[in-house]
């Protein structure tokens, strides 16, 4: 029986996945029983839910059922505390006091993080019971760097759990000395200056208050080489180095998440945390209304002018504080002409991914491809670019002065080379759920067709769908006049972007024109030398009114609504306003003025412009270690720098390697559990250094595989795991044969950017309809039988659409697994695939780097975009949102057959990014809670748009909005999720981000600034200065410092912090090489100075670059020596 609520169809879907998982698991078990692998069983336990994952990752044994009971009864956080209490009480076995406390904290943290992230394993080093100066005992939690993967809230709750455990163990509170209190403050400052900045910069007094009041010691391992200089050698602090994990738990946990902790404290009735109320909570963004203009108004009509208030929001500049070279700024904060905020969700947006018109993706010189990350002004910190062509596209000015709306990709490609200026970037489609998740004020909506249609519906007016989408000019004007409704959004221009005086100037020029029947346009005389006409022409551009410039004439084709908006009756060819100067004087602002002279209501087109800059480019590439290798078979330095085992064999080289081994009864050294030379079962013992018989293993492996001449096979130098147990060489050779690479845990992976999709068309994923039917896709979203490739289907929650390149790579991986089955395990081939379509329906694992739990998925097709499409639930099951991060896919059978915990590095963080447990069925309740805020409506209500004008908190309107949270524990949690905006093609747009195709840094920065130059909402001089200050200068200074502190290395792999006295490698006698080259130090010097001059950077920046250059020259340039005579000194 399934443990989730689902319809009959979804139940059948899950049953098929479970059956396929079971079949693959059994096949892998049969293979492993042969004794050719590290263990005789599959090392990835299957988990049906969060409780199974927790028990599988951190234990203790038999805890899963109790977790289910507690979560069902109390909820996640209370259950975590109760399970911690029961562990220290000995209900799951007798532990020592410290061991029990550590187990309790780990298990509770695992419950809080849904048993997915690695933090409970790797983020907590250990827990100790220590003594205060008065000899009382207290609890100390030692945090490590990977605690970051838990997120701020979970980090804070880990401390809360520690306090709860302390109380239940009868321990006293932590009583810090003044030196210990001040030590935290010193470490926080040092961490931010030498390592990296925190999300939240706490004041010194906040740190003191927190440390004095938190009842457990937040401490940890040394994570960075930087040492404190003041509060050193403290008896209870084991290191003088920075404790990064402890600082994360304190600053980004307790201090940053103080409001959330207080909510949990109040809810759970935990005492001792009221001091948090004294700390200042983070400031929320609020809408600030501009003060009224100083003009004198005449309010004789006593009309309500509140609708004409000027709106401004406080610009959020944090996203643009750092600009990376080669990655363009598309819009400065809240700058006119930037991305216009529009509410809604398309089938490929939501969950931190925003929609953009595909035309703008081409017009910014291909710097926006599907999956490209943008750092955004609001509502969150970042988003992912995806195409939505049903929203407003960009408006551009061409070289000849014409202004066009670019509403198709074809137009964008046609006019790209002719664009002089991008006047308006188009819409950014953001769903309500992202505002709810970020607790960001719901800002005023732009004037859009969906809002307009809601108004018409509310008044029971008749209209057609075609009228809403694309009304004729006269039709729109007449409809507005007759029905007393606002003018259609299509003909509503950006009047608010120019002043009322500018509108008046524009009006005077426009009314002086005439109708041109041959072109069906309104024709204006245009003389660019005439200042007044030139200004009026600019105002025409700024309001976004399309027009063509031809032979000293300006032709306006949308003349009918445009003229009426300016108070000119086209039909009667007369000015409807007699006293324009009086109207100008007596109106409050631009929108009041335009509404006074127009015969209908004109809404404000845009309230909010959103700033954005490029973050990371999209990614779709095979996961490779550095350097890439085919297998986890160590050969030391025998393969030279290229690490080729073929080379070692051909040259007869070997090396001494620390490795698990045993001498077999046949007299040979066996590195495996089955001796490759005689077939006896043996058990390699703990690692020891031996001269590896590389040649013997090479030829024996080729004989076993019946391969004569394999290609190049790259191997590792040595194992970093605890037991140094290795992978059979056969696997490395077969991977090389199939041109694939191995990761640290024995799996073969493909990384790609996470992008959400809830619905798709068969044509988008290159899969025949009959194949989709066999996978359970029988009807489209309207309930019609699936018959053609353009129907829209709802994606099943564990199905994924991989990139085309991933499909090709997995063809190679499947070939490797089939070869492994046939040649090594002597089994029948399993996949037998020849085409991409053959892989459709096969199972994969999806996994994020910061986690230790995988999620089973099923391939249903591939796209042309370099991203991994999956249901938002699927991404959330990996504890990810979709703001530009990348995760991995790998074939399920590959993981079952080749993964081993015993390959994992024996160091902090070594167990991250490894499938220590595998979730088979996706339960929406047990995924990252962010996805629960995603809205699932087919349309937003009229009240939403009206409330948005008030700048309301998102929680205050939640009742009128349906989100995923409202569907949990119902059959509808998996099906029937809606979206508000259609898109023609989910992978429309440039195939690859321009950043990845450009060569040198000079090319990248030139392209970056060329984009900035043509975007109205961007200041290229400011971009150039920010690139120099935030990227080039820190890099130059850092590399200069690194050069002066560098060590040396040898080609044999030996590294020295300082040059040995002999001047050569002590290991092999070879010449030593510098680790930081001259080129690395000065690589950005020329491009920085060129940019500073070209874009007239400030004198401060130019002088700073000169100082850095003189520092570099002092290292690498000899001072010129001039021969002088003694009499020269007497001149």
UniProtKB/Swiss-Prot annotation:
EC number(s) stated in the UniProt entry for this protein:
2.7.7.7, 3.1.11.1
Entry's InterPro entries? PolC_DP2 (IPR004475), PolC_DP2_cat_dom (IPR056172), PolC_DP2_central_dom (IPR056171), PolC_DP2_N (IPR016033)
GO terms in the biological process aspect are: DNA catabolic process; DNA-templated DNA replication
Q: Does the keyword Transit peptide apply?
A: no
Q: Which domain of life is it from?
A: Archaea
**Catalyzed chemical reaction(s):** DNA(n) + a 2'-deoxyribonucleoside 5'-triphosphate = DNA(n+1) + diphosphate; Exonucleolytic cleavage in the 3'- to 5'-direction to yield nucleoside 5'-phosphates
Alphabetized Pfam families for the sequence: PolC_DP2_cat (PF24846), PolC_DP2_central (PF24844), PolC_DP2_N (PF03833)
Please name the GO terms that the record assigns under molecular function.
Answer: DNA binding; DNA-directed DNA polymerase activity; single-stranded DNA 3'-5' DNA exonuclease activity
Keywords of the record: DNA replication, DNA-binding, DNA-directed DNA polymerase, Exonuclease, Hydrolase, Multifunctional enzyme, Nuclease, Nucleotidyltransferase, Transferase
Family the entry assigns: Belongs to the archaeal DNA polymerase II family.
Oligomeric and partner information: Heterodimer of a large subunit and a small subunit.
Q: What does this protein do?
A: Possesses two activities: a DNA synthesis (polymerase) and an exonucleolytic activity that degrades single-stranded DNA in the 3'- to 5'-direction. Has a template-primer preference which is characteristic of a replicative DNA polymerase.
Name of the protein this chain belongs to: DNA polymerase II large subunit
Annotated source species:
Methanococcus maripaludis (strain DSM 14266 / JCM 13030 / NBRC 101832 / S2 / LL)
Gene symbol of the encoding locus: polC
């Amino acid at each position: 029986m399934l443990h989730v609520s689902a319809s009959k169809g979804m139940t059948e879907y899950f049953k098929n996945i479970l059956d396929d998982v079971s079949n693959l698991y059994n096949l892998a078990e049969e293979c492993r029983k042969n004794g050719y692998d590290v263990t005789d069983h599959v090392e990835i336990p299957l988990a049906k839910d969060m409780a199974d994952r927790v028990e599988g990752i951190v234990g203790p044994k038999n805890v899963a059922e109790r977790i289910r009971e507690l979560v069902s009864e109390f909820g996640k956080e209370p259950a975590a505390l109760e399970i911690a209490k029961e562990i220290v009480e000995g209900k799951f076995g007798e532990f020592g006091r410290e061991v029990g406390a550590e187990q309790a904290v780990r298990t509770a943290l695992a419950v809080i993080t849904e048993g997915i992230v690695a933090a409970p394993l790797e983020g907590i080093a250990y827990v100790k019971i220590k003594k205060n100066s008065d000899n009382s005992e207290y609890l100390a939690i030692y945090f490590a760097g990977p605690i970051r993967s838990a997120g701020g809230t979970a980090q804070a709750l880990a401390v809360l759990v520690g306090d709860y455990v302390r109380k239940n163990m009868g321990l006293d509170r932590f009583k810090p000395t003044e030196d210990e209190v001040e030590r935290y403050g010193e470490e926080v400052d040092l961490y931010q200056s030498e390592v990296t900045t925190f999300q939240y910069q706490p004041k010194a007094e906040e740190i003191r208050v927190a440390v004095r009041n938190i009842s457990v010691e937040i401490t940890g391992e040394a994570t960075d080489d930087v040492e404190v200089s003041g509060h050193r050698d403290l008896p209870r602090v084991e290191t003088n180095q920075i404790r990064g994990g402890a600082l994360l738990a304190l600053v980004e946990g307790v201090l940053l998440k103080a409001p959330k902790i207080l909510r949990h404290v109040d809810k759970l009735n935990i005492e001792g945390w009221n001091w948090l109320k004294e700390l200042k909570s983070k400031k929320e963004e609020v809408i600030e209304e501009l003060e009224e203009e100083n003009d004198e108004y005449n309010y004789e009509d006593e009309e309500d002018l509140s609708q004409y208030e000027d709106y401004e929001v406080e610009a959020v500049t944090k996203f643009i504080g750092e600009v990376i070279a080669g990655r363009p700024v598309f819009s400065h904060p809240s700058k006119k002409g930037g991305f216009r905020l529009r509410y809604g969700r398309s089938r490929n947006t939501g969950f931190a991914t925003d929609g953009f018109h595909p035309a703008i993706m081409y017009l910014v010189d291909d710097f926006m491809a599907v999956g490209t990350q943008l750092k955004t002004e609001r509502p969150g910190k970042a988003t992912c670019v995806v195409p939505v062509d049903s929203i407003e596209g960009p408006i551009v000015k061409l070289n000849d002065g014409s202004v066009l709306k670019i509403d198709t990709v074809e137009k964008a490609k046609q006019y790209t080379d002719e664009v002089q200026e991008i006047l308006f970037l188009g819409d950014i489609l953001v769903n309500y759920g992202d505002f709810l998740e970020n607790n960001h004020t719901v800002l005023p909506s732009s004037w859009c067709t969906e809002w307009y249609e809601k108004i018409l519906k509310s008044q029971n007016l008749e209209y057609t769908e075609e009228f809403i989408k694309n009304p004729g000019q006269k039709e729109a004007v007449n409809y507005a006049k007759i029905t007393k409704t606002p003018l259609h959004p299509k003909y509503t221009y950006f009047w608010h972007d120019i002043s009322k005086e500018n509108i008046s100037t524009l009006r005077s020029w426009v009314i002086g024109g005439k109708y041109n029947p041959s072109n069906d346009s309104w024709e204006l005389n245009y003389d660019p030398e005439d200042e007044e006409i030139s200004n009026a022409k600019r105002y025409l551009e700024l309001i976004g009114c399309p027009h063509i410039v031809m032979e000293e004439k300006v032709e306006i084709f949308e003349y009918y609504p445009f003229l009426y908006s300016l108070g000119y009756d086209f039909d009667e060819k007369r000015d409807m306003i007699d006293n324009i100067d009086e109207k100008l004087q007596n109106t409050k602002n631009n929108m009041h003025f335009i509404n006074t002279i127009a015969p209908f209501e004109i809404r404000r087109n845009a309230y909010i412009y959103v700033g954005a800059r490029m973050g990371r480019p999209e990614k779709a590439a095979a996961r490779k270690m550095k350097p890439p290798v085919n297998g986890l078979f160590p050969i030391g330095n025998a393969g030279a720098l290229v690490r080729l085992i073929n080379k070692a064999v051909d040259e007869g080289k070997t090396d001494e390697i620390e490795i698990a081994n045993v001498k077999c009864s046949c007299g040979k050294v066996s590195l495996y559990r089955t001796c490759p030379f005689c077939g006896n079962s043996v058990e390699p013992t703990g690692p020891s250094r031996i001269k590896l018989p590389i040649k013997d293993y090479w030829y024996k492996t080729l004989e076993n595989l019946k391969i004569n001449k394999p290609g190049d096979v790259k191997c590792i130098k040595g194992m970093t795991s605890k037991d140094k147990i290795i992978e059979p060489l056969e696997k490395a050779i077969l991977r090389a044969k199939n041109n694939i690479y191995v990761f640290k845990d024995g799996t073969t992976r493909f990384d790609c950017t996470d992008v959400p999709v809830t619905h798709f068309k068969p044509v988008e994923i290159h899969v025949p309809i009959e194949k989709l039917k066999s996978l359970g896709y029988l009807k489209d979203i309207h309930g019609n039988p699936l018959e053609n490739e353009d129907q829209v289907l709802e994606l099943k929650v564990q199905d994924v659409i991989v990139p085309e390149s991933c499909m090709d790579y997995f063809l190679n991986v499947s070939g490797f697994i089939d070869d492994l089955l046939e040649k090594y395990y002597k089994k029948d081939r399993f996949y037998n695939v020849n085409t991409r379509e053959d892989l459709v329906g096969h199972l994969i694992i999806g996994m994020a780097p910061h986690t230790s739990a995988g999620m089973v998925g099923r391939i249903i097709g591939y796209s042309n975009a370099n991203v991994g499409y999956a249901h938002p639930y699927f991404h959330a099951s990996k504890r990810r949102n979709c703001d530009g991060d990348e995760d991995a896919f790998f074939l399920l059978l590959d993981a079952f057959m080749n993964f081993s915990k015993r390959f994992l590095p024996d160091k902090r963080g070594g167990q991250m990014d490894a499938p220590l447990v595998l979730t088979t069925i996706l339960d929406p309740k047990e995924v990252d809670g962010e996805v629960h805020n995603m809205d699932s409506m087919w349309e937003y209500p009229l009240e939403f748009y009206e409330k948005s004008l008030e700048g309301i908190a998102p929680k205050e309107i939640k009742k009128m909005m349906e989100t995923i949270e409202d569907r949990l524990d119902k059959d509808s949690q998996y099906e029937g999720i809606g979206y508000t905006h259609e898109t023609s093609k989910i992978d429309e747009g440039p195939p690859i981000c321009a950043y990845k195709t450009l060569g040198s840094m000079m090319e990248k920065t030139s392209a970056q600034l060329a984009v900035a130059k043509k975007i109205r909402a961007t200041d290229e001089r400011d971009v150039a200065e920010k690139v120099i200050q935030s990227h080039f200068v820190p890099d130059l200074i850092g590399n200069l410092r690194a050069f002066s502190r560098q060590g040396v290395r040898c080609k044999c792999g030996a590294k020295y912090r300082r040059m040995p006295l002999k001047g050569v490698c002590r290991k092999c006698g070879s010449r030593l090489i510098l680790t930081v080259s001259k080129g690395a130090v000065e690589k950005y010097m020329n491009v920085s100075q060129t940019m500073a001059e070209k874009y007239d950077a400030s004198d401060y920046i130019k002088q700073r670059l000169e100082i850095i250059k003189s520092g570099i020259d002092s290292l690498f340039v000899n001072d010129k020596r001039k021969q002088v005579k003694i009499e020269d000194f007497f001149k």
